[in-house]
Regions:
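Catalytic active-site module of serine/aspartate enzymes centered on a nucleophile-bearing elbow/loop
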Residues: 280-322
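Hydrolase active-site cap/lid region
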Residues: 163-219, 228
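Short beta-strand/loop motif that positions the catalytic acidic residue
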Residues: 233, 239-241
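The serine-hydrolase catalytic nucleophile loop
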Residues: 86-98
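Conserved alpha/beta-hydrolase
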Residues: 100-119
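Alpha/beta-hydrolase active-site loop
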Residues: 124-144
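Catalytic histidine neighborhood in serine/cysteine hydrolases
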Residues: 260-275
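An N-terminal hydrophobic leader/cap segment in hydrolases
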Residues: 1-53
Length: 384
């Protein structure tokens, strides 16, 4: 019996430190990135792949998407740097490609060290990654025709945004989806929910985990507190969090939002969990946010009072049926606009993005939407 308890404790301990710095790796091939040359909305785009040396000396695999010179709407174009989650890769950012490109913005995606096809064994949930962002931003700035830069991160990538942005005035705006505020708080939550250790053992387990991670990765998890950077960060920002996030509780975004130092900030909450595909209306709002601040360069106070800019939007208040109807109507409108602006032969050559390339390749919400749609169809048939 005693041996079983020891074995259980050992498994719990290993599960926790691996959850922090060695989660399941996203394995893919270069073919999964799609064609290096493609047509989208009557423009020809190219994907260029780069190898950059990280702050710790690891090769980071990166990709940059931009229109060919004859198709550039402007000589200088802004760039969004997308930062992926802890067990994800640059494929996650490619899932946002359409929304970014149609806003006349270029996209740069990266596999952080320890992720995807990049070198390295461990991640650091934003600590080392924040120094890697500087390496990437320095590189992006040297690409001919590059304008302002925005950051878009999810989970680990969102925490990285928060840690880094205040250090660099070149970052003009940021979007953070599912960030954590304080890793000490998060670690205790993970121990209680996922590892399920007794309360008396939590403190001791975290101390052992801290020393293990410090030895393996040089990361002191007690210093991993994005919330310390929040008051110092001034760029316009959007926070996004699912209300049923089982990995990072949505209260972490509440905490960050409350102390965020920028005058223009918005918190969007939606139905779903950590890896649920975000509603299309949120993705569109993010796209418009980047367009306003990177392309139109709207000033913080233009056409808005501070009261209007500092809002929390609980997008889960309406019924799910109403939301799905709204999304379908908006998607149909977008489709009609695209059909008017594109030739049929060009549409056949448009970039084909794998459905699995949307946030962490998980679409848990699709089944729920289909069920509701089937119910509505049955009601319509009965009425007829």
């Amino acid at each position: 019996m005693e041996n079983k308890e020891k074995e259980k404790s050992k498994m719990s301990y290993e599960s926790l430190w691996k959850l922090v710095i060695r989660p399941e790796r996203d394995n893919y091939t270069i073919k999964d990135l799609g064609n290096p040359k493609f047509t989208f909305l009557s423009r020809t785009y190219t994907r260029k792949d780069y190898d950059l040396l990280s702050s710790e000396g690891y090769i980071m695999k990166c990709s940059f998407f931009e229109p060919e010179i004859p198709f550039r709407p402007k000589k200088t174009m802004p760039v969004i740097l997308y930062l992926h989650g802890n067990s994800s890769s640059r494929l996650e950012g490619i899932g946002m490609l359409r929304e970014v490109l149609k806003r006349d913005i270029n996209l740069f995606v990266v596999d952080f060290p320890g992720s995807g096809l990049s070198e390295g064994e461990y991640i650091s949930l934003g600590y080392h990654e924040s120094y890697d962002v500087k390496v990437i931003v320095d590189f992006i700035e040297k690409i001919p025709g590059t304008g302002d830069i925005g950051l878009w991160g999810r989970s680990m990538g969102a925490a990285t945004c928060m840690i880094y942005a205040h250090r660099d005035e070149r970052i003009k705006c940021i979007v953070m989806d599912s960030p954590f505020a304080d890793f000490n708080v998060l670690a205790k939550e993970l121990v209680l929910k996922q590892i399920k250790l007794p309360n008396l053992l939590i403190g001791g387990a975290l101390k052992i985990v801290r020393m293990t991670i410090l030895k393996k990765n040089g990361l002191d998890i007690e210093k991993l507190k994005p919330i310390d950077s929040a008051p110092k960060t001034k760029q316009p920002a959007i926070f996004i969090h699912a209300v049923s996030d089982e990995l990072i509780n949505n209260k972490h975004s509440d905490m960050l939002f409350a102390v965020y130092g920028g005058k223009e900030k918005k918190l969007l909450k939606c139905i779903g969990n950590h890896n649920t595909r975000r509603p299309s209306r949120i993705i569109r709002e993010v796209g418009q946010f980047f367009y306003d601040h990177l392309v139109n360069k709207v000033q913080n106070n233009n056409n808005k009072s501070n009261e209007e800019a500092n809002n929390i939007f609980n997008l889960d208040l309406n019924s799910e049926e109403d939301k799905i109807k709204e999304e379908k109507e908006n998607e149909n409108q977008d489709l009609n606009k695209n059909n008017e602006n594109s030739q049929n032969n060009e549409e056949k050559n448009e970039i084909k993005l794998n459905n699995n390339q949307i946030i962490d390749h998980k679409e848990e919400s699709i089944n729920n939407e289909q069920k509701i749609e089937n119910k509505e169809n049955k009601k319509d048939n009965n009425n007829q």
